[in-house]
Amino acid sequence: MSRLFLEDGESVPVTAVSVCGNFVAGIKTKDKNGYNALLISKTEKSNNLNKSKSEFFKKINLNPGSLSEFKSDEIENYEIGKHLTAEVFEVGQYVDVTGTSKGKGYAGVIKRHNFSMQDATHGNSLAHRAHGSIGQCQTPGRVWKGKKMSGHMGNVKKTIQSLKIVDMDVENNVIYIKGAVPGFNGSELKIKPSNKK
């Protein structure tokens, strides 16, 4: 993350996100597909493209990349092969950002679910960071689904809603989003207009 200073001197924490290399790879219409949507390709190097995907990109004359679909009713101004730049966004707009969170490995309940530790003394033997009871008795005789326990932490799909675009560099196709976004440096993100703003 970085920070920007606004005109009134306020320091705002921002994440710089590059939006270059995005092309329209397909257009879905209500008549043909039942809904309106844009299929966007993010150009990336790949040595293991399957044949159907490589033929798809060859047919539309685009470099191969990852595909994402975005529902939109404003599809008239787009055509296959059009390069999407930072100009599709605007300063002050609120967006929802989806990405894969950083993987933390195997974690206990204190780190993973914010449990409290047990007593350090008073008869506690080797259970200081244990989660304690995980259920009842013979009824129901099982552990409920969704029980908070230790396990793999992170590396899951996460969406952060209503993040504000505070600035943009159209020349370099970079937008500056207020706050943090999921994932590590250089990871792929999906950005769309906010549902709640």
Per-region residue spans from a language model:
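Extended basic (Lys/Arg/His-rich) segments that typically form rRNA-contacting surfaces
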Residues: 1-197
